Swiss-Prot record:
Lineage top rank: taxon: Bacteria
Activity regulation as described: Uridylyltransferase (UTase) activity is inhibited by glutamine, while glutamine activates uridylyl-removing (UR) activity.
The HD domain, residue ranges: 443-565
UniProt family annotation: Belongs to the GlnD family.
UniProt-annotated stretches for the region Uridylyl-removing: 325-681
Domain ACT: 682-763, 790-858
The protein's name in its UniProt record: Bifunctional uridylyltransferase/uridylyl-removing enzyme
InterPro entries in the record: ACT-like_dom_sf, ACT_dom, HD/PDEase_dom, HD_domain, NT_sf, PII_UdlTrfase/GS_AdlTrfase, Polymerase_NTP_transf_dom, UTase/UR
Species of provenance: Burkholderia orbicola (strain MC0-3)
Species classification: Bacteria, Pseudomonadati, Pseudomonadota, Betaproteobacteria, Burkholderiales
Record-level Gene Ontology MF annotations: [protein-PII] uridylyltransferase activity; phosphoric diester hydrolase activity
Hydrolase keyword on record: yes
GO BP, sorted A to Z: regulation of nitrogen utilization
Residue segments, region Uridylyltransferase: 1-324
Record keywords, A-Z: Hydrolase, Magnesium, Multifunctional enzyme, Nucleotidyltransferase, Repeat, Transferase
Amino acid sequence: MSAHAAPSPEALSRRAEFKAAKTEMLERFRHAANVASLMHALSKLTDDALKRVWDECGLPATLALVAVGGYGRGELAPYSDVDIVVLLPDAHDAALDARIERFIGMAWDLGLEIGSSVRTVAQCIEEASQDVTVQTSLLEARRIVGSTALFERFTVRYHEALDARAFFTAKVLEMRQRHAKFQDTPYSLEPNVKESPGGLRDLQTILWIARAAGFGSSWRELDTRGLITDREARELRRNEGFLKTLRARLHVIAGRRQDMLVFDLQTQAAESFGYQPTQAKRASEQLMRRYYWAAKAVTQLATILIQNIEAQLFPATSGITRVLSADRFVEKQGMLEIVDDGVFERHPDAILEAFLLYETTRGVKGLSARTLRALYNSREIMNNAWRRDPQNRATFMRILQQPEGITHAFRLMNQTSVLGRYLLNFRRIVGQMQHDLYHVYTVDQHILMVLRNIRRFAVAEHAHEYPFCSQLIGNFERPWALYVAALFHDIAKGRGGDHSTLGMADARRFCREHGIAGDDAALIVWLVQHHLTMSQVAQKQDTSDPEVIKRFAEVVGNERYLTALYLLTVADIRGTSPKVWNTWKGKLLEDLYRITLAVLGGANPDAHSELKSRQEQALALLRLETVPDDAHRALWDQLDVGFFLRHDAADIAWQTRVLYRHVNAETAIVRARPSPIGDALQVLVYVKDRPDLFAGICAYFDRNGLSVLDARVSTTRHGYALDNFIVTQTERDVRYRDIANLVEQQLATRLAETASLPEPSKGRLSRLSRTFPITPRVDLRADERGQYYILSVSANDRPGLLYSIARVLAEHRIGVHAARINTLGERVEDIFLLAGAGLSDNRLQIQLETELLRAIAV
């Protein structure tokens, strides 16, 4: 807001009048959405209001008031900025400045978000030459009021100075940089309707470039010019209209400028389009799918148009580089180009051949505009007969089986809609959202991300990222079977029913139709069926229990299946969200792989042999640390078998070295160190046991912003608790070595206090969790041996959640024997092993479950 005096009664009256007229327009739009009429009406309303203020300020006729940007186009969104330039003659007196400032202040008083500049023609041209954003804004300049001669002089000077080639280069670079900010994908779960790839800004960029080059300023003019076809022009107009309408609705719903389609507004936006929820899909999911298809079409057509404009602005000095396929494809300027527009109609099998050539031909960096257009216009060719053609099936398998280029080929097949035309069930999940609180990609993008992750394991340049996975896939015969499993593992999402079971049927049919038989087909189908199994065992079950390992080994059956499942599982978790994967989950999976591999190799998974092996390894490490012989006995004699099975040899040795002198300590022993697996802090607590101990430790972690990844709780024979926690601090970058001493001191002090447990802090839920809350679930049941009770908790993640659970357990004097904390993005699925005298009482179980549900409710 400007710093001028408070608005006069006349100004307040003008503002009220302007607001009333605008409100009436927005109401009409709510009931009869014609976005073009709304934007033009808002522009005219603003023009008229500014003209009145201009006249009232008595500004001389030698000046001109010019609208620029979207306002200059006459396309004003409900709460967009109003960008104007006060154009001055070459010479003006200082007294004029005060009158111009008064005009701008009065424009603000109307309630407009004014973006203003005051320049001479020469200053405009100079600014435009230095800043492509200014140059772009002035490209759409429109006179509102004032000197026509001055505005025409500006227009002539502007176009004389405009270098269409330099403008093209700058705008394409700007578009690439903008796309990079959105990870080069239109499939964000909260896209920016204006700025994201495939959004309105892409369409505007094309029209700016075309206008600067003199090719036209509308889709019809570009059609007339031959840069696009009539069909493409219609498609562009249709999607542009949808995106403009969506943006305007977001503004109206939010009551302010709002270009990001955030979770909070998706349902309201969907309802404003008339979408209704069904049993299978929320209204918001239907809207988002429509958005993703529009963004995808815009991305495809924008690529075609930019290449065509570039060809006109920069005529190629050389033509065909080489012939790639007789009568079908050539390479031209590094792009794969069809020899004529009828190639796909004459040779439908050339559609998939294009992607095989793109994948296998060095130097080819993409498909030319001509090829993309032909693909776009060949959708009717990709029918059932085309899908069943043995030659096409063979080509598809060749694409899958190439040593490199697979990820790029499949991404391009998806971008051009060919993948969904070939695999109809894949088409069903294109643009499908996942409201499970941990996938941040649509289903099709997640599948392609998993495929990409598996491929990266096999690429030497990426071997340093996941060395163990790279080692395994290097020895894995026919890795293409993993790629097929990746394509089908989530292909049945959103159909209702178990997507693993439904996906099995799809995978089995694919194998049968593509000549995949024997063990390869069996492996692919089995992987789709069991793609969640290894993750569930590693993260939710007690893998120190030999029976758990034995059952898992029976499911897997052999080393090839185990390796395949491990590689798919790592790729799958990493493909859900950058936040879900961490080194701790990696260690859990790798440990499960190695233990199971030993069992499959003939090792006997009995507790006694494993106990003896770990103790011997730990003793060897203690000797290296110069711990006296037999010094370990004082501690080990107090520990049960479970302790040795829950910790590896290195961890047992570290804990022994810390505690062997303090077995009967009177005060708490707390030690912390950076976790050996990295990216976390390991905290050891050794103290006389008490019912509220676990809750007290969790309270400390909660208050200090530390998230618990894993808790392993042991009780010695002489009544001490030996608890180990793996914690992380996710809110900021932290060097765990630097905070280890502080954690030791603070937690030891906290455990020495006798204060009662504090009330849990109910931290704010994330926006995603608020929009898509899950129903909290609590399940309490005895384990198979009747020794412990297993408590399973599923809820939205939030700060203080673990402590809230621990506090309820402490109030009922229930001991926590072990805890497995499994955070999946915005959702937690925690498992606790409990011991308590009253847990067999049905009434106590009901009371406990009720209180836990109350504690974790949002």
